[in-house]
Swiss-Prot record:
UniProt KW Transcription keyword: yes
Gene3D superfamilies with a match to the protein in the record: Homeodomain-like, Regulatory protein AraC
InterPro entries to which the protein is assigned, alphabetical: AraC-bd (IPR003313), Homeodomain-like_sf (IPR009057), HTH-like (IPR037923), HTH_AraC (IPR018060), HTH_AraC-typ_CS (IPR018062), Tscrpt_reg_AraC-type_HTH (IPR020449)
Provenance organism: Streptococcus mutans serotype c (strain ATCC 700610 / UA159)
Taxonomy of the source species: Bacteria, Bacillati, Bacillota, Bacilli, Lactobacillales
PANTHER family: ARAC-FAMILY TRANSCRIPTIONAL REGULATOR, MMSAB OPERON REGULATORY PROTEIN
Pfam families in the cross-refs: AraC_binding, HTH_18
GO molecular function: DNA-binding transcription factor activity; sequence-specific DNA binding
Alphabetized PROSITE patterns for the sequence: HTH_ARAC_FAMILY_1, HTH_ARAC_FAMILY_2
Annotated HTH araC/xylS-type domain residues: 176-274
TM annotation in the entry: none
Signal peptide: none
Function of the molecule: Regulatory protein for the msm operon for multiple sugar metabolism. Activates the transcription of the msmEFGK, aga, dexB and gftA genes.
Protein name: Msm operon regulatory protein
Amino acid sequence: MNILNIYNEFDINNFDLSVDHYGSEKCDRGYSFGPTIRDNYVIHFILEGKGKLTINQHTLDLAAGDIFLLPKDISTFYQADLQMPWSYIWIGFSGSKAENILKQSSLFKRFYCHSGRSSKLFSQMMTIIQFANTPLTSVNELLMVGELYKLLAALIEEFPLSHLEESNSSTKAYVNQVKKIIHSQYGSSLRVNDIAKKLNLSRSYLYKIFRKSTNLSIKEYILQVRMKRSQYLLENPKLSIAEISNSVGFSDSLAFSKAFKNYFGKSPSKFRKEIQNN
């Protein structure tokens, strides 16, 4: 099969992951594309020749066997070499799961990796490109999405995150989960031990990673969320102090008033009067 100068585009937007377009091209000398910002992800595999990729104001020299990623929502520019212009194949894809899957590979942050035609990754890209020979049916669209999952699995297998990157990624995920729990349950009796058990982590480890990320302890963050919410609720004159106290996780309105005064330097009643006077 002649893989050069193929382009197919699809309008499939009902999947967690979908193939938007794929193709191959033998570029003319100095051929360039961009700078442009795209709304999907595109993986290129360089078959032969050389070229340059500029991303985040940093230019990479790339050659045959290299893979490069054009990320979503970031300006990119790429250009074929003047003497040895490159040829490449590419797969463009999108979907709600695309970013989280890509983040499991070092390609997501580095934007390029070196592979080869003997790799599973190249073989899987070629499998998708060869759909150019098949009619566009709903069955083939589903098959193509299945092959895209296999491609991304091969990418993660060949270029996984380093242990440090994986650790940092997991830490960020835990911190975000803690924040999500707090924002959804600040109105109840929320304890740090309960959050740690829910995430199957030790309290000391959770405290350490959360404080490192936010400069706050989990208790301090819970209080911050409760105080900011109570500040908003106090703007409604129809709500009593007791009602507001209960809504932000305090069963005792006196304890709430004390916490509010310690946090803002004034009582809830005084804060409300100042709002009404303004």
